[in-house]
Amino acid sequence: MSDWMPIAKEYDPLKAGSIDGTDEDPHDRAVWRAMLARYVPNKGVTGDPLLTLFVARLNLQTKEEKLKEVFSRYGDIRRLRLVRDLVTGFSKGYAFIEYKEERALMKAYRDADGLVIDQHEIFVDYELERTLRGWIPRRLGGGLGGKKESGQLRFGGRDRPFRKPINLPVVKNEPHREGKRERRERSRSRDRHWDPRPRERDHDRGREKHWQERARVWPENDWEREREFREERVKSRDKRDRSK
């Protein structure tokens, strides 16, 4: 388990559908769909993918000027694209920002995630479509992150990193017959403290916050791993360029 990492270095739909990346069978149809999908990144996208950030959860009213004002604090911006609907022209709530220098990219990656812009807490990550090998977008059953309400959570990204697998011995419970008094006492205790939804929500929020914070801090606490990760992405891009 020494080579375990919370962030995926290669996209595997089956692993992405697992909270700790250890599932051996797909748990929903979307994972199956992603496993069978073949995706080719959009060749019309320009710019250096290794200097590009993905910015999501934007207020639909946020304009390009506002994004440029905020993200230029971290360094010189080469290109900024707020993705809009081709028909209506309305914002889709996410953007791509390309910096001129890697130092600016890394600073924005560390510091801009979680910023509040126009009353919305934004999410910042590297661009993955052209840099993460094997990438499958959400519309094909892949992607990373997501909300519980959508029923399509994907792990191994900054938003929802893999949790470290815990190997525990399986203990078989022997049959145990409760007496009437035991059952009655347990029933009374449950009735006195019955409030499942708030407790479950609080517990889930706490766990999600814990793992999100670990993902945010991880690059700062382990710069060597982060450098190796980015160097591998550079090598992968160079090989791809030479093969064209």
UniProtKB/Swiss-Prot annotation:
Residues 51-129 form the RRM domain. This is U11/U12 small nuclear ribonucleoprotein 35 kDa protein. Component of the U11/U12 snRNPs that are part of the U12-type spliceosome. InterPro entries: Nucleotide-bd_a/b_plait_sf, RBD_domain_sf, RRM_dom, snRNP35_RRM, U1_U11-U12_snRNP_70-35kDa. It comes from Mus musculus (Mouse). The gene is Snrnp35. Disulfide bonds: none annotated. Pfam families: RRM_1 (PF00076). CDD domains: RRM_snRNP35. The lineage of its organism: Eukaryota, Metazoa, Chordata, Craniata, Vertebrata. There is a cross-link at K172 (Glycyl lysine isopeptide (Lys-Gly) (interchain with G-Cter in SUMO2)). Residues 146-162, 173-185, 192-244 have a biased composition (Basic and acidic residues). One of its GO terms (biological process) is mRNA processing. GO terms for molecular function: RNA binding.
